[in-house]
Amino acid sequence: MSHGWGYADHNGPQKWCENFPIANGPRQSPIDIQTKGASYDDTLKPLKLKYDPTTSLDILNNGHSFQVTFADDNDSSMLTEGPISGKYRLKQFHFHWGASDGKGSEHTVDGKCYPAELHLVHWNTKYASFGEAANKPDGLAVVGVFLQIGEDNPKLQKILDAMDAIKSKGKQTSFTNFDPTCLLPKSLEYWTYPGSLTTPPLYESVTWIVCKQPISVSSEQMKKFRSLLFTAEEEKACCMVNNYRPPQPLKDRKVCASFK
């Protein structure tokens, strides 16, 4: 993005409203999910996620996170049902994480932070492209998955092995034959609410689907995330850590739960 936003004091979340006034809008993300305030909704369907590993293309350090991009020119990697109607295609996934294991997730649950959070970003195929869908109220659906410190997660290994090739901003390498289904928790019980992108331009276009059950990551694996750099090769190195936006006010929104 232009405007040079980031996560430092001079360009971080507290300053985003200067260039992106929607930062103070009515449906901003992330939020603190207060479990007592979330209402069970028996009309919410189970999530249906069908991903085709041949659609994964490449992995990129964009100077804010790293993302794995997918071919989205047909319906082979899709999210349907859950809280959404219609079909949403997978565009990319990325993570947010902290400088230490005590924080790093964007969403929190009853004030509890996790060390990292995975976001799988999908766009509504009633629009012609991701770009067209990105600012529409029903344009995007993002599945959020918390990472919790525990056992080494072998499912993350292929991603971690690619990190050395994308250490600095602007680096990209091919990343093929990957099925992100392997990154989902066993239980797909979720909370859902209307929200926004958590990075500029902060469009209020996201149906958030936050999985209740976290996946495992070891402290050693988290160190690999933190080995990436916010900076390009020729710049003074700055470690990619704390690339998360803090929780935003819930305002007039309701959080629904797919489970009792």
Swiss-Prot record:
Location in the cell: Cytoplasm
Record has Iron as a keyword: no
Swiss-Prot/TrEMBL site (Fine-tunes the proton-transfer properties of H-64) positions: 7, 62
Gene3D superfamilies with a match to the protein in the record: Alpha carbonic anhydrase
Binding site residues for Zn(2+): 94, 96, 119
Active site: 64 (proton donor/acceptor)
GO biological process: carbon dioxide transport; regulation of pH
Catalytic activity: hydrogencarbonate + H(+) = CO2 + H2O
Binding positions (substrate): 198-199
Cofactor(s) required, per the database record: Zn(2+)
Domain Alpha-carbonic anhydrase positions: 3-259
Any GO molecular function: carbonate dehydratase activity
EC number(s) on file: 4.2.1.1
PANTHER family associated with the record: CARBONIC ANHYDRASE (PTHR18952), CARBONIC ANHYDRASE 2 (PTHR18952:SF120)
Family as reported in the entry's similarity comment: Belongs to the alpha-carbonic anhydrase family.
Protein's recorded name: Carbonic anhydrase 2
Species this chain originates from: Pseudaspius hakonensis
